[in-house]
Amino acid sequence: MMIYITEKCSMGCPHCIDDAKPDGQHMTFETLEKVMDFVIKSKIYRSIIITGGEPTEHPEFSMFMYYIMGRLAKLKEKCIITVTTNGFWILENEENREVCKRMINGSSDIEVNFQVSADTRYYPKRLDVTKRIWREKGFVLCDNCIISIYPQGRAKTNNLEWSSKASKCFNIRALSKQLPNPTLESLVWTLALKGKFCQPAIKINGDIVLGESVLCPTCASIYDEPETIVQKIKDFKCNGCNQINDRLPDVYRQFVI
């Protein structure tokens, strides 16, 4: 599952499905506290993606990370936190790099990774991928993260060619109708076992979306009970990505109409 801690990003990538801008808003600490309450109560904390926007542009990025790590450490269970980033904040100065290393080495139960996107096809600024830091523990350079363009946000505005097979929300919506007596925990865990870690996503105000973009319509809220959220996922209707789902065979399309 993903947590958006900010909608701000100064990069301006042409393919951004969030249409993130330099004036994007940030999650408040009060909301983060509620988010972690929800994540722990719902037992969906084993694999968390911290994202944005550009998460390192949140003015309290380090404090947010340490708070999340602290809450998870109390559970005494193995957890993975992945920060998706363009990497420029990390290269900005040695202090930032040391902060990241402390996070990576901070707990035996919590694995922290920085997934650094360096796909030169779409990023307007070129990251220096020769730096030694990228070969150290906890840093993963991803120069081909963008497997396919998704027609949302600036990618849609810029009419970029796309090749997606189904909407981003397809898997969790289909799974909610296939699993017997699904819970939020079973939905998230089943997706994770298949290598799908990005659904659902929690926005900066606590809203829950089923795709991977803040532009997706709200399905539920962290203030709902987990059982209510599952029912809302089952009942969810959205026609925002019909240009993709209309291509699906009927056996699959039935789950997203």
Q: Where are each of the predicted segments found?
A:
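Accessory C-terminal segments flanking Radical SAM cores
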Residues: W162-I257
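Exposed alpha-helical structural elements
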Residues: K34, E98-V99, T228
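Flexible, charged surface loops at secondary-structure boundaries
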Residues: I40-K43, S107-S108, K194-G195, D235
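Conserved AdoMet/S-adenosylmethionine-binding subsite of the radical SAM
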Residues: H58-A192, K196
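Conserved alpha-helical substructure of the radical SAM core
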Residues: M1-V83, I90-E95
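Charged/polar, solvent-exposed surface patches and flexible loops
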Residues: K34, R132, G240-Q243
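Short, solvent-exposed loop/turn segments at secondary-structure junctions
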Residues: S10, P55, F88-W89, D119-R121, ...
